[in-house]
Amino acid sequence: MISKENKKKLIELKEYVALATINSKYANANIELIKYMTEEVKSPGVYVTLNKPFRTIESDLKNSKIDTRVIIFIDAVTKTAGGEIKKIDQCLFIGSPENLSDISIAMDQAISSLKEKDKFLFFDSLNTLLL
């Protein structure tokens, strides 16, 4: 559960936000932020996964009782890891995290497909993009 103090800070933030978290709290912080955006703010969004395959992220979110139907995923891991890729309406698979052009195109398509005014774009890791 996101703390009252952190919730207040999130509410006060501007339209564009970059948050950083320490490694030991990374997984929990990601889930708390997605839960906050989908349940309290009630915004749909795009989740760009650069560290874990879509199926793993989807399972983690569902285990935390997060409705993944309001999230479009961009998976830049599964192909690189040799995982099985099946066409899924809510997930766009990208060749690798290093393919920034494909990630950018996929983000544009995903964000454009969300008709709501308020939406979020979430990267599970920016460090991976620096490789």
Segments predicted by a language model, with ranges:
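Glycine-rich P-loop/Walker A and Walker A-like loops and their local beta1-loop-alpha1 context
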Residues: 1-60
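Nucleotide-state-sensitive switch-loop elements of NTP-binding domains
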Residues: 5, 64-94
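Short coil/turn segments at beta-strand junctions that form active-site/ligand-binding loops
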Residues: 43, 69, 117-119
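A structural signal for isolated positions on well-ordered beta-strands in alpha/beta enzyme cores
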Residues: 46, 72, 120-122
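Short beta-strand/turn micro-motifs composed of small residues
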Residues: 49-51, 75, 123
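Short amphipathic alpha-helices and their capping/turn segments at secondary-structure boundaries
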Residues: 57-69, 107-115
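Phosphate-binding/switch loop-helix module in NTP-utilizing enzymes
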Residues: 81-131
